[in-house]
């Protein structure tokens, strides 16, 4: 299973922003104003793991189709009147999350609400490819900045309520 930061988890920026807001901060540090992320909840991540356990034949990567959001929109959803402080991107930090690389596209298939990257190995047999999927285009690239599905500030605010973060 491959997915980005789970919304509200320790690896997510949400707890960091929440702490700043709870401390009375009105200026939110943003490493890069163009930064985007995928939105996946803990429940969605668990469901994907269970699906992978049930459907996998061995070696596949399951990737959930998630909406994207701008980190600046997340800050606005949590603190509507906030100001941004551009603090610069840190070493190793990614501007956008990448779930399927162009190299992965050679063996990636799209299903209704997820993708599967099948092993590109000699021992893998095509009969193991799950029915109902469509081979993605060559050089397909699935990242948080080129995703067709985006959350608005209001949709982020509603999604935050679903993970018990209310402002």
Where are these predicted regions, by residue range?
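Strand-loop microenvironment adjacent to phosphate/nucleotide-handling motifs in alpha/beta enzyme folds
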Residues: 1-167
């Amino acid at each position: 299973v491959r997915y980005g930061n789970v919304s509200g988890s320790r690896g997510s920026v949400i707890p960091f922003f929440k702490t700043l807001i709870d401390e009375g901060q009105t200026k939110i540090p943003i490493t890069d104003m163009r930064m985007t992320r995928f939105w996946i909840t803990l429940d969605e991540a668990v469901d994907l793991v269970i699906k992978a356990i049930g459907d996998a034949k061995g070696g596949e990567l399951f990737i959930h189709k998630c909406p994207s959001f701008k980190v600046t929109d997340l800050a606005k959803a949590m603190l509507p009147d906030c100001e941004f402080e551009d603090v610069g991107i840190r070493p190793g930090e990614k501007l956008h999350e990448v779930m399927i690389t162009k190299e992965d596209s050679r063996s990636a298939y799209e299903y209704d609400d997820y993708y599967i990257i099948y092993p590109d190995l000699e021992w893998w047999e095509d009969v193991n490819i799950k029915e109902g999927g469509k081979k993605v285009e060559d050089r397909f690239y699935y990242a948080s900045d080129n995703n067709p599905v985006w959350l608005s500030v209001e949709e982020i605010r509603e999604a935050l309520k679903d993970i018990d973060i209310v402002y």
